Design a protein with these regions (language model features):
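Phosphate- and other anionic-substrate recognition elements at nucleic-acid/protein interfaces
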Residues: 1-129
């Protein structure tokens, strides 16, 4: 399995790709919050995986800043998990006593959460009437 952690921000996203064995496939890299950046992310995922690999992509729920990348990932058929920022914060604190909070650390934390949390449910765009 390959896990992709994305820390979403207004103008840019920090991304991190790791295998379930703990091998870093792509250390933290930054993409712009636009179609070109999303294509760069998709290329990095494809370079880091084999066709038989199961892929999980996780990002924090950050309101409207995450809508475009979330839509892109879903359109590409990637299982995507939208994680409550409170859970990310608590998970990060459980891993370290340091008060380290950076976008780079968050991207790694989100990927680690995907590897360890079997209770996460992938995002579905369901409308109820």
């Amino acid at each position: 399995m390959v896990c992709v952690g994305i820390d979403v921000a207004k103008d840019k996203h920090d991304c991190f790709i790791i295998s379930s064995e703990g091998e870093i496939l792509a250390d933290v890299f930054t993409i712009p919050n636009n179609a070109e950046g999303f294509d760069t992310l998709l290329q990095a995922i494809r370079r880091s995986t084999r066709p038989e690999d199961k892929i999980k992509v996780g990002l924090e729920a950050t309101g409207h800043y995450s809508y475009n990348i979330l839509g892109f990932l879903l359109d590409k058929g990637l299982p995507t998990y939208v994680i409550n920022p409170l859970h990310t914060n608590l998970y990060r604190k459980s891993l370290s006593l340091r008060k380290t909070k950076t976008d780079r650390v968050d991207a790694r934390t989100i990927a680690a959460m995907l590897m360890s949390d079997v209770d996460l449910k992938s995002y579905t765009d369901t409308a109820y009437h």
